Amino acid sequence: MIPVVALVGRPNVGKSTLFNRLTRTRDALVADFPGLTRDRKYGRAEVEGREFICIDTGGIDGSEEGVETRMAEQSLLAIEEADVVLFMVDARAGLMPADEAIAKHLRSRQKPTFLVANKTDGLDPDQAVSDFYSLGLGEIHPIAASHGRGVTSLLEHVLVPWMDDVDPPEEVDEEAEYWAQFEAEQNGELVEEEEDDFNPQDLPIKLAIVGRPNVGKSTLTNRILGEDRVVVFDMPGTTRDSIYIPMERDGREFVLIDTAGVRKRGKITDVVEKFSVIKTLQAIEDANVVLLVIDAREGISDQDLSLLGFILNSGRSLVIVVNKWDGLSQEVKEEVKETLDYRLGFIDFARVHFISALHGSGVGNLFESVREAYDSSTRRVSTALLTRIMKMAEEDHQPPMVRGRRVKLKYAHAGGYNPPIVVIHGTQVKDLPDSYKRYLMNYFRKSLDVMGTPIRIQFKEGANPFANKRNTLTPNQLRKRKRLIKHIKKSK
């Protein structure tokens, strides 16, 4: 399960600044996530190839009464959900009564907590943080979040030990293997690709059912299972935790993940429901395919788009399900379809299904799209095929000129799966305009017949063999150079 890191502290100690710096590493910020308490933000970040969810819990006012109420309502449950808590203090302001009150609550929770002293730029760190040792939270990590100073050290000493113990792939070795395979195929040699021990067809497809409260997620789960496995009431938020349910359909194993809904801000009254979104985000990360359920009668809301943004940033396969389609007039149905085209036009790779989970209409067709999306996201593609497709795209539409020189695309290989990643090597490829990158992405999608999953394209510059090498003259060139210098001196 992807780890969760919570940022806790008084207002204006720099939590949001650190949050932005952490999440900017992936450019996958989901800020001010609708359905949460005011100023709460969720984002995805990465450190040394390991992903985690970061939560900015908002400020705690610090009065004794305020700590008791605000901590209970906003932060304590976030702390319980988190794997690591970063307790931030202001080194410039010094130790405040609110810091002591917050530290007392954190100590009582017995949650892994690390004290982070922010705003140490221009100060002597040892002297600035000395007062905070009285909080009894052990070592203090001085940083300057606005400038990024000390953040790397914080990540290495605090977050890395809590990440999954999986080393990032050795990119150089993989590329060398792909390049060797490509060279052999170019020379007409018969290349037998090594059999991969991993066969995605042998594993169950993990299917997350997500959406706002009361859109019919649990009803859909029960309809798929054919039994009432999940408690369903006609009121939002009856599901409080993600429920994993194994099942089999048409000889294929699945694991259904029914998640708690994401509710609009201001309508949340039960504190337990406020943090169920963490389970939703973790379920998305854990899933292979995500069913995003939308209420046809309420249309597409900002909460739906925020959840969709997190799914896209996660790179998960996607099937869009428009529920409660029964009983709508033809005129209303046409209006809903127009709204979908307008607001979700950029999601051209996802299948859209119109269903009634309550009555079962259209539910059976979902699994065809789920399997299609899963197969597309896990299919293995050879280097030779990807390079041929890249060359065809280049012939149909040449790359533009950059600083007077044509961008050259050399070869392409697979860089990962679920989502499919295509790595293109060449010269000046990082200067390609976004329009050409989108053209390549769409060309690969059409050529590979990929549906239901996003495709990511990464660009890498080829190494210059003459970089950092000085020109050396041959003996003949040296003699000519001496004669030329003599001639120039005589002419003067």
From Swiss-Prot:
Purpose: GTPase that plays an essential role in the late steps of ribosome biogenesis.
Annotated EngA-type G domain residues: 3-166, 205-378
Record: residues binding GTP 1: 9-16, 56-60, 118-121
Species: Cronobacter sakazakii (strain ATCC BAA-894) (Enterobacter sakazakii)
UniProt cross-references to NCBIfam families, sorted A to Z: GTPase_EngA, small_GTP
GO molecular function, one term: GTP binding
Protein name: GTPase Der
PANTHER family, sorted: GTPASE DER
Domain KH-like: 379-463
Keyword Lipoprotein among UniProt keywords: no
Family: Belongs to the TRAFAC class TrmE-Era-EngA-EngB-Septin-like GTPase superfamily. EngA (Der) GTPase family.
Gene: der
Residues noted as binding GTP 2 in the record, renumbered to the chain: 211-218, 258-262, 323-326
Subunit annotation: Associates with the 50S ribosomal subunit.
